[in-house]
């Protein structure tokens, strides 16, 4: 069955323009609804320690962007929820599937977050299904995102368990080496995997990993994503939590994977690596540029909002769109 589907990735695809119907690109609406809430952009900074911290989460929430706080400072999550709610902001946190997480979820009944993401590398697992059911029993009003997965069967099974959205992508990220360490994943065919999974989905899909350019956001939406999680494009900012390093007079920021030894604190079951990215200005500037580029994408799609991107034609060009050039 699988061998019948076309296999391609972001660099293999070009979207085909339609007649523009807006007089200014600024008229294009990039907003998206997830659950009961509307957000400015269909993008989510990856819930990784070198991408997001509580300060950035607060900034994003205040400015109308969606965020997911990482799960690697377990004791701070409950105070974080309280602090966000005291400011009238949404609380969006991550959990794992260890036994202690069940107690933690139950403890949130009096002050439930609006969003919980179940965040493990291989999300098509009984442990994830059990956690979905537990959250939905204890916190029925909380929107549950579950992942990560890479097949339609996984999407359907997590949806049937009660997940409100699923996160698609196993190993395509810049600092993820799952595909090399295990031989498994969606690296090299992430966009095709997204398309495959989205065709089976009844609820929102979040594309996670493999985004290298702003145009890849539009391509993700074309192939079925409601939201797009991005790591490397959000790493390396002045505000980024990653450690600042100076090399030959230039400043860089550390960026490492959630399954790396740098996050784990030990060299065990490592599926991530660390890289240095040149410091690239403020996060707000990147978000503004993303919005402007997405507005341009909507204008090329011949529409007024994100939905227009879902219906454009495309061609598969097999790695030739750069013509040998790099960005």
From Swiss-Prot:
The keyword Methyltransferase does not apply. It is an enzyme of class 1 (oxidoreductase). NADP(+) binds at residues 205-228. The keyword NADP applies. Keywords: NADP, Oxidoreductase. Catalyzes the irreversible NADPH-dependent deamination of GMP to IMP. It functions in the conversion of nucleobase, nucleoside and nucleotide derivatives of G to A nucleotides, and in maintaining the intracellular balance of A and G nucleotides. This is GMP reductase. It comes from Streptococcus pyogenes serotype M3 (strain ATCC BAA-595 / MGAS315). The lineage of its organism: Bacteria, Bacillati, Bacillota, Bacilli, Lactobacillales.
